Amino acid sequence: MKSYLNEWAERYRADLTENIMPFWLRHGLDRVNGGIYTCVDRDGSLIDTTKSVWFQGRFAFVASFAYNTIEKNPEWLAAAKSTIDFIEAHCFDTDGRMYFEVTADGRPLRKRRYVFSESFAAIAMAEYAKASGDMTYAEKALKLFKDIRRFIATPGCLEPKYLDTLQAKGHSIVMILINTASRIREVIADPVLDQQIDESLESLKDFVKPEFKALLEMVGPNGEFIDTINGRVINPGHCIETAWFMLEEAKHRGWDKEITERALQILDWSWQWGWDEQYGGIINFRDCRNLPPQDYSQDMKFWWPQTEAIIATLYAYEATGDEKYIEMHRQISEWTYAHFPDTEYGEWYGYLHRDGTVAQPAKGNIFKGPFHIPRMMIKSYELCKELTK
C-alpha cells in the first residue's frame, strides 16, 4: 500500500511541476496586462482573449497552493501576485460584486447572478496571504467572504434563477461556501467562517434523498423534492466534490463521526450513479428516476468529475482505512490517466465522449483552465504523503 501511494504521490507531483504549471505559465499567463488567459487550443495557442474572472481567482489560488504545498517556486508566487493584482484592478464592479468575464485589458464583458467569482477570489487571497506572508490579503479574503454572505442575504441583490412560481435552492452555493470558508480559516480566524460551514453542512441535508440514494442539485426551500427534469438531476462529480469537502471538514474536527458518515454515504451513492461500468470514468448527469436527463452532455466524461473522485477516494481511505476506497482510487486514477493527458502537447483534454475518445481538443475555455487538475495533484500528493507517514 505504501509503495502504491508513494508512486501516485510522485506522479501527481511530477505532472504538476513538469506539465501542468509550465503549460499555463507559458501559454496562459498574460505578461502584458497581468492575469491569465484560459481559452487556448490543444497546443496552447490563444483562441480567445476573453478572460474568465473565475479563473483569475482559481489560478491565483492554485499557484499559491502549489507554492505552499509542493515547492517554494518564485515563478508561481509571482504569477499568483500578478493575477491577484489584475483581479483587484479590473474584476470588481462599483457595487462590490465581481464580473464573470472581462477583456484582455480588464474591461467588463459579463456579470452573472452567482457569487462564484467572489468565492474564487477570496480563496486566492487567503492562499496568497499564506504564501507571501502578507496578512493584508487574509483580511481582504475575509472581507470578501462577508460581502458574499451579504450579497446572498440581501433580497434583490442577486437575480433569482427562477421566477416566483418556482421556489428552489441549489446545491452549488451551499457546497462551495464550505470550501471557501475553510480555505480562509487556514489564515485568519473569524466566527463567521465556522458559522458558514455549520450552516452549509446543515443545509446539505435538504439535498440528500435516501429514497433515491442520491444528493440532488436542486430542491425546494425546505428540501422538498421537485419532480421535474431539473429537480431530478444528479451531478455525480459535483456530489463527489461535496463529499471530499465534508471529509476535509470532518478531519479538521478530529474525524467528526456524523459528518464522516454522511460524506461517505454521498460518495458511495454518487459513485454508483456516476461510474460507467461499460467504459469506465464518471459520467456527467443522471436522473434520479432513471429517466433521460435533459443535458445533451449527460453521458460525456468531463475532466473535473474524475479529479474530484481521485481526491474523494483518498480522503475516504484516510477516514476509514477501508481498502475498497483504494480500489476506487486505482480505478478512477488509471482511467483518468489513460484518457485525459495529452502526451504530445501537454496538459489534459477536458471533454471526452462516453467511450473515452476526445470530443474536442482545446486545453481551456471560460470553464476549463488551471484549477481542478492542479488542485487534484496538489491535494492528492498531500494526502498520499500523509497516508504513508
Identify the role of each PLM range.
Residues 1-389:
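Glycan-recognition and catalytic cores of secretory/periplasmic carbohydrate-active enzymes
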